[in-house]
Amino acid sequence: SYKVESKKELSLDDCLIMESLHKENAESKKLSYALKANQIYKLCKASNIEVFFLKLENKFIAARIISIEENISYDIFACNSFKSRLDGATQFLMQYIFDYLKNQNIQYFDFSRIPLGRKGAYGVYEFKKSTRGKLLQYNSEWVFFKNKKLRHLYYLYNLIINKKDFY
């Protein structure tokens, strides 16, 4: 049976597991990027980041990195092995995360970043639809800032200099 572990602090070994899981994910989805353990480690140092690991028979088969800001949570990265695509493992992990967030009084979960119409993303879009949440279309890139002042400055720069609104 499946077992979920939630972590707010990661070891480098945890990050190596995630790197390996994401490598399988990138291979199956033909992603143009790969997550590296040292990058994951740096990202997960932020106080608002939580990681959920899914195990089957004591073997890691999936992981999910999320960010929590007040009452909104954001999906950052999914690291799914080939095995996690079987028998609803990914759905099990997401249901666990949704229940966990609900118990923490987090009202929203934003899957982010993968828009409708992106080549090869139809399966992801269908998975998002199956959660029965509200569908929102983004009109720009997803950007993460540790410093909220920098986020606002970036927004103003895009609005005034680039003449585009990134929200």
Q: Where are the predicted features?
A:
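Active-site/acyl-donor-binding loops of N-acyltransferases
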Residues: 104-167
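Conserved acetyl-CoA-binding loop-helix of GNAT-fold acetyltransferases
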Residues: 85-99
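Short alpha-helix boundary/capping motifs
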Residues: 33-34, 91, 118
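Surface-exposed alpha-helical segments enriched in charged/polar residues
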Residues: 41, 95-99, 126-129
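Short, contiguous acidic/charged loop-to-helix segments that flank catalytic cores in large enzymes
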Residues: 80-88, 115-118
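A conserved beta-strand-loop-helix scaffold within acyl/acetyltransferase catalytic domains
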Residues: 1-84, 100
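Amphipathic coiled-coil/heptad-repeat helices and related helical stalk/stem segments
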Residues: 36-37, 94, 121
